[in-house]
């Protein structure tokens, strides 16, 4: 057992720290009970501010705003942001990364569209190397109109809003950068965490975000824009402020629109007095003109531990609010439900308990911790799972229980300052000791590891007044700072990180000081490998999961979304449910950089059976992203990304750094497919007739499908290319299947045969496309028994809970054997054996074996052996 890294303590926790030398999390009693007896309770004290709010406060401090020292320390604002302002070689900071053939453009689903127009934007040099990228995307859709938004950090340079938006009037083919969202009052500005929504009845769009009111400065409130499209332009109809911050910090707001009632619902994290968070809910029943008093939804026991809430509306006006509740060692996703349009809420329910990797974000993430906020969506389609709520999250293996050696060998840092070639070698399990003499003093260590090993490194001894930057670096390219592939980053007085190695090789630990002394700043780092515990859901340091519920109370067993190898990272899973009831989830994914796991694409998976089964993952974005690049300050992935859908169309919206500093992108993926059947046809007995079925991809992305052709009477005599098979169809492609049907001369066993064509979507499990047609047979005259052909008709009924009728025809007299067999091939019952004449014959099976015992429900096979051939039919038995 080992300690988790201690947090930046608040002033309120100082007495506790002095008494226990531990930073106790603000946890529920239940959480404390979940911790094993030997597991030390040593973790971060509550949740952190969102990326948008942290950036906002840093800017205010840079401009001279004075905040209480306790708040600065509470949020880690007493040290500079991690911007990698030094390098081994002069002038390399803004150089493009040397990725060579590894960073190649590929084809995702549909074509990516860049949403922002960088023309006229400030350059890195003119902005004093302040960050200029975009992140935290959101998108809403209504017909051909799309409205997207993003955090836009160019506002840190211009002094304008730190939030941008843009629109498309042609379904996402082209986009207009809308610039800065207008302020409700002069002098105010939007400050990020954008959320967009639309009323599906009226077509009104809504833009919500954090807002800086000139009357209270950095203590953020909320602002809301309502608008519509006219003449190819987004027109603002109203601009209001749902909530003022006052002395509180309002953070990570979210918006939902009820198209049934027209109500607006907003939730947010209220850091009361700027300190500890609670989830609050407000609503408007008059289209945003006025707002209710806040309802506190999170439990008092979770005070300080909650973040990332999202309101959602079901098809009957039911309101859900989900949020993240930090705990140690287990965190939780929570939910409450309202059945009176948000006037009141039922009791808090737990969606899941999970181990989280809160120490570091995905590779290239430049904040010293990681958010584990939920994604969520409700099925409002007319499909079979209408009303179902889906929630997604990131989850880690339980590396908290990885044992540090009791008496480890100590390795003392001795390399030349900041040079990888002379990095101090060590073996995982050793204890590292060193010290930094100044803010430019960089310590480097190197070790070897194998693919699939999960490490946990934690600095458990350091000066309380010193904040360290500690990161894991891949050995792929360490020649210049701008090419480093930064896999983890922890910024803390007691930094730590966990990571599953994606390849065999050498890896580096890099450590320097973020604060301004005192020097020398000494430290001790414990190192260990984690051994997976049986029963853990996650396979490595971060996987993506989903669960669903039809009422918010009873939840399904979580299902793994990503199908990559169990040693690649991924983060920020978001989910939507389209108009057919299919669910789609997507996230940042790092599987396509096998040597380091530092380069990312967006990936998606889909479910057509209500979230029980998810299809093979598909790449969404067209180009790789290198988040480690240090263009215009540090890249920032933010805390979330956006996705929405309507009809068969799905719109993922994300940010990536393919062009250097990150930009927002979106695409319109149409998953539209169908099965086509020919009209009914007639045929004479003993003759062939052809029926041409078709599988059509009317969408704009490739799809893979499996098809079958079946009939009731047994007239099906083959198909071209086959009666069952699979095919991958490009956009707008068609697969024809031509079936041959040949009834007997006397049209046995019925005059009309029903022929069915069914196609299953391989990438959207549970989604099928089917149609049927009929073939009517006219008996030919003077048909003799000899005109019959050997055939075994489909069992009737099938499946059956009792007696099954088995009919067959013989074209000539001869020996016959008809028996039932189990799926394993063992004989169950002999039904007929001996000489029979040509013509139609029938036998029955009563669900018993040769000894007269009832057999178990399951799949069996009727096998006819006659005329030197063997024919078989499946028989389903239910009890």
PLM features per residue range, with description:
Residues 784-813, 821-826, 857, 874-879:
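Surface-exposed, proline-anchored Ser/Thr-rich loop/turn motifs
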Residues 431-520, 529:
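Acidic, Ser/Thr/Pro-rich low-complexity intrinsically disordered segments
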Residues 518, 597, 745-754, 851-858:
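Short glycine/proline/serine/threonine-rich loop/turn segments at secondary-structure transition edges
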Residues 33-407, 528-686, 698:
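C-terminal PAP-associated
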Residues 745-777:
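Terminal connector regions
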Residues 853-879:
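C-terminal tail/sorting-segment detector
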Residues 465-469, 700-735:
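Surface-exposed binding patches on compact interaction domains or structured appendages
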Residues 406-415, 419, 672-684, 773-795, ...:
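Residue-level detector of functionally pivotal "anchor" positions at catalytic/ligand-binding pockets or at interdomain
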């Amino acid at each position: 057992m080992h300690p988790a890294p201690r947090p930046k303590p608040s002033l309120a926790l100082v007495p506790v720290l002095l008494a226990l030398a531990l930073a106790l999390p603000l946890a529920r009693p239940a959480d404390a009970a979940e911790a094993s007896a030997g597991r030390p309770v040593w973790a971060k004290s509550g949740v952190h501010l969102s990326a948008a709010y942290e950036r906002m406060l840093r800017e205010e401090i840079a401009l001279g705003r004075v905040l209480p020292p306790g708040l600065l320390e509470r949020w880690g604002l007493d040290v500079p942001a991690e911007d990698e302002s030094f390098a081994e070689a002069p002038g390399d900071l803004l150089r493009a990364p040397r990725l060579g053939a590894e960073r190649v453009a590929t084809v995702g689903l549909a074509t990516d569209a860049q949403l922002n127009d960088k023309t006229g934007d400030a350059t890195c040099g003119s902005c004093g190397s302040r960050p200029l990228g975009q992140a935290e995307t959101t998108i809403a859709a209504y017909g051909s109109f799309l409205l997207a938004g993003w955090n836009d950090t160019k506002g840190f340079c211009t002094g304008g809003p730190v939030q941008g938006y843009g629109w498309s009037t042609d379904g996402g083919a082209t986009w207009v950068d809308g610039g800065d969202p207008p302020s409700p009052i002069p002098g105010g500005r939007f400050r990020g965490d954008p959320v967009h929504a639309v009323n599906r009845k009226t077509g009104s769009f809504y833009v919500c975000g954090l807002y800086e009111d000139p009357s209270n400065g950095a203590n953020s409130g909320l602002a809301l824009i309502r608008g519509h499209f006219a003449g190819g332009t987004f027109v603002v109809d109203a601009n209001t402020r749902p909530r003022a911050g006052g002395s509180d910090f309002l953070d990570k707001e979210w918006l939902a629109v009820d198209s049934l009632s027209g109500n607006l619902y907003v939730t947010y994290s209220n850091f009361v007095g700027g300190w500890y968070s609670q989830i609050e809910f407000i609503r408007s029943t008059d289209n945003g003109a006025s707002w209710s008093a806040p309802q506190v939804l999170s439990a008092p026991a979770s005070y300080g531990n909650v973040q990332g809430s999202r309101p959602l509306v079901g098809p009957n006006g039911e309101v859900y609010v989900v949020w993240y509740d930090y705990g140690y060692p287990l965190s939780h996703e929570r939910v409450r439900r309202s059945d009176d349009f948000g006037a009141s809420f039922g009791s808090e329910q737990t969606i899941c308990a999970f181990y989280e990797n809160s120490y570091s974000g995905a590779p290239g993430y430049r904040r010293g911790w990681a958010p584990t906020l939920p994604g969520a969506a409700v099925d409002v389609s007319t499909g079979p799972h209408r009303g179902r709520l889906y929630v997604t999250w990131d989850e880690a293996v339980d590396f908290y229980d990885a044992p540090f050696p009791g008496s480890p060998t100590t390795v003392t840092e001795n390399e030349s300052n900041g040079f990888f070639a002379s990095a101090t070698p060590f073996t995982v399990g050793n204890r590292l000791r060193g010290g930094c003499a100044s803010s430019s003093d960089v310590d480097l260590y190197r070790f070897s590891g194998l693919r699939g090993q999960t490490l946990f490194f934690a600095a458990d001894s350091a000066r309380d007044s010193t904040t360290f930057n500690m990161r894991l670096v891949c050995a792929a390219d360490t020649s210049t700072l701008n090419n480093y592939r930064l896999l983890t980053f922890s910024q803390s007085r007691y930094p730590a990180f966990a990571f599953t190695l994606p390849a065999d090789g050498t890896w580096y630990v890099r450590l320097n000081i973020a604060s301004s002394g005192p020097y020398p700043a000494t430290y001790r780092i414990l190192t260990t490998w984690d051994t997976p515990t049986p029963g853990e859901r996650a396979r490595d340091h971060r996987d993506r999961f989903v669960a669903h519920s039809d009422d918010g109370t009873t939840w399904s067993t979580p299902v793994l979304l990503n199908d990559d190898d169990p040693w690649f990272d991924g983060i920020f899973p978001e989910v939507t449910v389209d108009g057919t009831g299919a669910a789609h989830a997507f996230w940042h994914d790092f599987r396509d950089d096998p040597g380091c796991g530092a380069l990312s694409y967006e990936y998606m998976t889909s479910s057509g059976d209500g979230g029980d089964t998810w299809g093979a993952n598909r790449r969404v974005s067209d180009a790789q992203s290198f988040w480690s690049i240090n263009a215009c300050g540090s890249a920032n992935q933010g805390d979330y990304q956006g996705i929405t859908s309507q009809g068969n169309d799905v719109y993922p919206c994300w940010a990536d750094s393919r062009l250097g500093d990150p930009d927002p992108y979106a695409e319109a993926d149409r998953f539209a497919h169908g099965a086509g059947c020919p009209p009914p046809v007639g045929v004479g007995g003993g003759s062939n007739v052809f029926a041409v079925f078709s599988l059509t991809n009317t969408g704009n992305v490739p799809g893979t499908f499996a098809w079958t052709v079946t009939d009731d009477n047994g007239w099906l005599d083959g198909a071209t290319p086959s009666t069952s098979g699979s095919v991958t169809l490009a956009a707008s492609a068609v697969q024809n299947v031509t079936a041959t049907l040949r009834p007997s001369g006397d049209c046995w066993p019925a005059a009309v045969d029903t022929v069915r064509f069914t196609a299953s979507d391989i990438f959207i499990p549970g989604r099928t496309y089917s149609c049927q047609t009929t073939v009517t047979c006219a008996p030919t005259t003077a048909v003799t028994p000899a005109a019959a052909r050997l055939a075994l008709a489909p069992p009737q009924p099938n499946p059956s809970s009792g007696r099954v009728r088995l009919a067959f025809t013989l074209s000539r007299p001869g020996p016959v054997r008809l028996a039932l067999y189990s799926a394993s091939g063992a004989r169950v019952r002999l039904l007929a054996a001996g000489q029979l004449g040509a013509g139609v014959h029938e036998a029955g099976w009563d669900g018993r074996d040769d000894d007269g015992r009832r057999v178990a429900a399951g799949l069996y096979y009727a096998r006819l052996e006659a005329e030197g051939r063997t024919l078989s039919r499946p028989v389903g038995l239910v009890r």
